[in-house]
């Protein structure tokens, strides 16, 4: 009857070691040391907990492939929540089709994403998605949050609480992954 938390294992070790690197389409590089990552994960996890997220609750990310999504996922896993993601190029109906099945409590959204050198603004679609996800109690926006009801990512990584991981059973789910049908499975 083992109980563990994968985040404890992933974030254990030398705090100065570089463990997360993000490179955007233009080649700009951002990186986190284990200590920086641990701090950001702890801060986001504390905000999730304060928002009412409990072990087994679902949180979702409708965002590009950026380091903030990794931090979001690690924070959720650290408190026993289950993570799901959707590509930013999904229209609101596609996001609702997927996330409506899992009733997420929190939603992480990228304010913009870049594809093929072109920037797309997602902020105008957030309310459309929320209209179909009535169980969402909070929205966190990577980048500029244009709606005062939404939290900015920078405000969610501003705290420095210690990381406290919830140990869960070995069979506790961590992710819910959706296929677009292109996997052949």
What name fits each language-model region?
Residues 1-21, 39-44, 58, 68:
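AMP-binding/adenylate-forming domain of the ANL superfamily
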Residues 11-13, 37, 41-44, 48, ...:
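Adenylate-forming
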Residues 59, 76, 173, 179-182:
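Conserved S/T- and glycine-rich ATP-binding loop of Class I adenylate-forming
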Residues 75-154:
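Structural core segment of the AMP-binding/adenylate-forming
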Residues 16-18, 141, 151-178, 185:
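Conserved pre-ATP/AMP-binding loop-to-beta segment of ANL
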Residues 47-96:
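Conserved AMP-binding/adenylate-forming
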Residues 7-33, 145-149:
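AMP-dependent adenylate-forming
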